[in-house]
């Protein structure tokens, strides 16, 4: 039973880490990366469709993204969606290709992005701590129902705490790595 609670907590904590990784990939660094456009959707035949399903997205010359839409009539909609996003990118179209030059990040923009990254990391830490709290309350419930002893409960809580410490350390590692990436000019 204790192992079930611990493995459930571990899988939930790993999902929190995966969510943090996804959030970190969306934060713009100085380099172009197709995942920058993952959050952009376009109205296509009455459904919101992700931009990465509407065409080929590739990196050109390190600081430029190119989009080659499958349906050329969507070019104006794609441009509008990019302009309305909070990425601060200005698309330029040449024929059937949309180019997105990424402007270099200013020092102020870098600091703002570091704040965003820190907030995402804090959200992940809070999520992990909430999972720890849930697991500990499950252990207390088992103790209350006399399914485990107090020693087993304490041992289970120690295991959950060790798992929590390990996951929070991973969050710190991801945060440190992203901050260094952002502050590198």
Swiss-Prot record:
InterPro entries: Ribosome_recyc_fac, Ribosome_recyc_fac_dom, RRF_sf
Record-stated family: Belongs to the RRF family.
Cell location: Cytoplasm
Pfam families xref list: RRF
Annotated function: Responsible for the release of ribosomes from messenger RNA at the termination of protein biosynthesis. May increase the efficiency of translation by recycling ribosomes from one round of translation to another.
An annotated GO BP: cytoplasmic translational termination
Gene: frr
Protein name: Ribosome-recycling factor
